[in-house]
Amino acid sequence: MWNEFKKFAFKGNVIDLAVGVVIGAAFGKIVSSLVKDIITPLLGMVLGGVDFTDLKITFGKSSIMYGNFIQTIFDFLIIAAAIFMFVKVFNKLTSKREEEKEEEIPEPTKEEELLGEIRDLLKQQNSSKDRA
């Protein structure tokens, strides 16, 4: 059972996934900072000094902090756009590699052509013997 777990845990895909999760978490922090510290203040300046984090609806002692929700939506949209662009570039690169592989199929050499002809002749001889 331990050996099976080691095979699973140290497979390339699992390690790649773990690295992706760690990088994704770090990327999420960067995007959150970008939205919170740069984009939201710029939007606030354009919209007349509005600070999105201060936007709220108060009911007695309770508040609905919809400004934070708007900021989280910006986070999501930027992360989604970045992932979309990454996947688009990745797909374009992999499709180019596949096209190059298809183009790289070499023409058969004279030896290969002759071997193919010999194979075909042997098949004909064997099939004519089977008929007789």
From Swiss-Prot:
Membrane association type: Multi-pass membrane protein
Transmembrane segments: 14-34, 67-87
Keyword set, alphabetical order: Cell membrane, Ion channel, Ion transport, Membrane, Transmembrane, Transmembrane helix, Transport
Keyword flag tRNA-binding: no
Primary residence: membrane
Subcellular location: Cell membrane
Top-level lineage group: Bacteria
Protein's UniProt keywords contain Oxidoreductase: no
Subunit relationships: Homopentamer.
Role: Channel that opens in response to stretch forces in the membrane lipid bilayer. May participate in the regulation of osmotic pressure changes within the cell.
PANTHER family: LARGE-CONDUCTANCE MECHANOSENSITIVE CHANNEL, MECHANOSENSITIVE CHANNEL MSCL
Gene: mscL
Organism (species): Bacillus anthracis
Listed SUPFAM superfamilies: Gated mechanosensitive channel (SSF81330)
Family annotation (Gene3D superfamilies): Large-conductance mechanosensitive channel, MscL, domain 1 (1.10.1200.120)
Official protein name in the record: Large-conductance mechanosensitive channel
Molecular function as annotated in GO: mechanosensitive monoatomic ion channel activity
Family the UniProt entry places it in: Belongs to the MscL family.
GO cellular component: plasma membrane
